[in-house]
Amino acid sequence: EKRGLCYTIFAQTGAYEDTGLTTIYAGTSGDELAELTGITIDEMKRAADDMTPEEVARARAQMKAGLLMGLESSSARAERMARMVQIWGKVPPIEETVARIDNVTTGDVRVFAEDIAASAPAALALYGPVGKAPGLEALQARRAA
């Protein structure tokens, strides 16, 4: 954003019983693609290295607030229950879920983030004028560096 390389960028995750998915989406021009992908990888690695206990505490608070506020909606409760059955094969009590969130440490998150940033399997999907885009191999090398 600071460099004006993209008009939108966001990340999202999906968790399942035996796998997970982290997606980073960025909308940019073909001319900015190579620089944007490199900076995105560097930022993922930096975020893992620079993570503070305060950031993890804020993330825990946000997760718990979203979870507890979601209990006010019957559709959100039903979606949560279905997701829990899909992932865990049961619906754990809300207190158990909150306790699990509270037990996550900065070290836990840092180790996970470092793995995602440096070595988790990756895929690359591009559309539009992408002739100047680096290949997946080049991006993997930058992640591993």
Task: Label each residue range with its predicted role.
Residues 2-70, 139-145:
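M16/insulysin-pitrilysin zinc metalloprotease superfamily fold
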Residues 46, 64-145:
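C-terminal regions of mature proteins
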